[in-house]
Amino acid sequence: MKRKIYDQLVSWKQDGAGRTALLIDGARRVGKSYVAEEFAKAEYKSYLLIDFNRVGDEVKDLFLHYLNDLDTLFMYLSGYYNVKLYEHESLIIFDEVQMFPRARAAIKYLVADGRYDYLETGSLMSIRKNVKDIVIPSEERHIKMYPMDFEEFLWAMGNDTLMDIVRKRFEAHKSMGQVMHRRAMDYFRQYLIVGGMPQAVQEYAESKDFDRVDRIKRDILTLYRADIVKHATGYEMKVESIFDEIPAQLQKHEKRFKLSSLKKEARFREYEDALFWLDDAMIANICYNSTEPNIGLKLNMDRMTLKCYMGDTGLLISHAFDENGLVSEEIYKKLLFDKLEAVSYTHLRA
């Protein structure tokens, strides 16, 4: 599927490759590995992908023993993966680089060598947890990757023109007309329900089956819960309690996240690390109140008053109806026709 971040990769290849490695970081399952490999296939003569989530010790040992002998390192990597490497025409991808921080530290020497280009991918939560024993290379350029936006969703649905029409009418301050507006809102409601996680979008584009889409989204939510337990060491219970409370807080009129809903007399300082972790992992978007809305928003940020959103609207839908096991086709259809009150009634009755 077409992703806007691809153009940023091309710009890096033209302007920064050879002087920096590119690190794509973001939440799990947003499509980092996919776009990295598609970029490599289209823009390079050859590429070598090392998935540190799956690779064995025999490959990891190469980075431990041959950083002072890069000729031998490249020879072994080329032979192990059966990929011929061409100087200045090949890309080496470190996928899930957070699983082996020593490879990330090696970027300094690999970029200085200059023979090949380097692209790293990793989930933000893990990368920041696994840097304490390495020197973070200054030769990295960071870009963040998010779930698919509305325009990318339209592309996946085979509609390449609607967003251009919306944009032009908006810039001209003119109405789209009832027919086009109705069509745009229909697509937009589909996007809000399905969300922007690539696997869910692809399934919906192919099958239009909400049950299958919901199963995919629930698998991602399960993965996020496992990550919380594994990586939010020391305050995982607080992270999980905030995560579970997000749908209920957003259902309220003001949508402000009240820590008292988690524990009576709860204080912000008790949950500050947990909120930061969710935001840092890009599982949630934390929105703080600004007491003086101007250019310097951070200068007037009230950290005690906040709203907590999910990083993806489709995941929010599945998360909100979590106790039902699966969101039924009936609920999805009511959401599609903007009947949220009917959905709430059906949910409470069940």
Specify the residue positions occupied by each region the protein language model found.
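Pre-Walker A adenine-sensing motif
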Residues: 3-16
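Hydrophobic anchor at the beta1->P-loop junction of P-loop NTPases
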Residues: 24
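Conserved lysine of the Walker
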Residues: 32
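Short glycine-rich substrate-engagement loop in P-loop NTPases that contacts/grips substrate
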Residues: 58-81
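Structural recognition of the conserved hydrophobic beta-strand(s) that form the central parallel beta-sheet
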Residues: 117-123
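Interdomain motor-coupling "hinge/lid" segment immediately C-terminal to the ATP-binding subdomain
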Residues: 131-248
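Accessory nucleic acid-recognition modules appended to NTPase machines
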Residues: 206, 210-349
